[in-house]
């Protein structure tokens, strides 16, 4: 799989970008702040419908523009697919597949499969559980695009149930049973949708764990072994069925009903889960050194890459300024993986950040002041 063409309109610092890409290695070179990361971010957005840098879409639209458009042409086993994503503030985003509108942008998920390495990856180890849940859900969705719908349904249920919990607390003291009966209905919705999401995550971690262990040994031979485990907010065994999770969620919500009403928040469900990262007998978060944290973060991405490769065609590798963050051993390990990928798209502040033996096409990025303000440009 590779991206043959990338077009941007009013995306971040790019008023317009029109790039012909090819298999192999391509390096976008330019000083920090010139917009090279925005190119990688656009490709990641096309693959996942999300940014690796911000939680909302609004910052992706260039200042003063009404919308941003990301268009890609992806080639997979000789077949071309064109994806257009239109990002608009305050309105639902739109998508087209082969120039035809689709009902939801989620319908284009799976066209571009990618794995991103970025400086932000350190948050996978040192950040809060939400970072690790997002990693799992993005990877699960890349493997099975239908998971995006499961996650969207679950998020909707959480919003509705949280609002109901806030109002139900007062209703209980007024003796209003109708609100509590409605809460029972939403308990069922949370259990049904949450169980599907938890089962998908557990299945993913089951397949991911041996790949993480192997990747960490590659990056840090002789170090403590790395291990991962899906830790839920309920008492559940590893790698169980959706039916088991559904029953366990219903039981947990019954037991924690008073606490949820008192606090007005959902205390049970996959939004409270975590991906446990361990080095030897210690948790990586709080105990891993800076180098060990980087090795663990890279191991999670390398494992994702290997898992997607076993599913089918090679995913596109996106390397956002990571070589500058790594020591020599980790640079070599990452370069070895990149050597076998069908397409690698890399950003670097200076050409010296790229391995010296790489045969790579280089695209220089600059900034220019014009009628659109300060915008990113490709040097001709």
Curated annotation (Swiss-Prot):
Lineage: Bacteria, Bacillati, Actinomycetota, Actinomycetes, Mycobacteriales
Assigned GO CC terms: cytoplasm
Residues annotated as transmembrane: none
One Gene Ontology biological process: double-strand break repair
UniProt cross-references to PANTHER family, sorted A to Z: DNA REPLICATION AND REPAIR PROTEIN RECF
NCBIfam families: recf
Chain residues that bind ATP: 30-37
Name of the gene encoding the protein in the UniProt record: recF
Location relative to the cell: Cytoplasm
Record's keyword terms, sorted: ATP-binding, Cytoplasm, DNA damage, DNA repair, DNA replication, DNA-binding, Nucleotide-binding, SOS response
Functional description taken from the UniProt entry: The RecF protein is involved in DNA metabolism; it is required for DNA replication and normal SOS inducibility. RecF binds preferentially to single-stranded, linear DNA. It also seems to bind ATP.
Species this chain originates from: Mycobacterium sp. (strain KMS)
Family: Belongs to the RecF family.
InterPro entries listed in its UniProt record: DNA-binding_RecF (IPR001238), DNA-binding_RecF_CS (IPR018078), P-loop_NTPase (IPR027417), RecF/RecN/SMC_N (IPR003395), RecF_2 (IPR042174)
Single GO MF annotation: ATP binding
The protein, known as: DNA replication and repair protein RecF
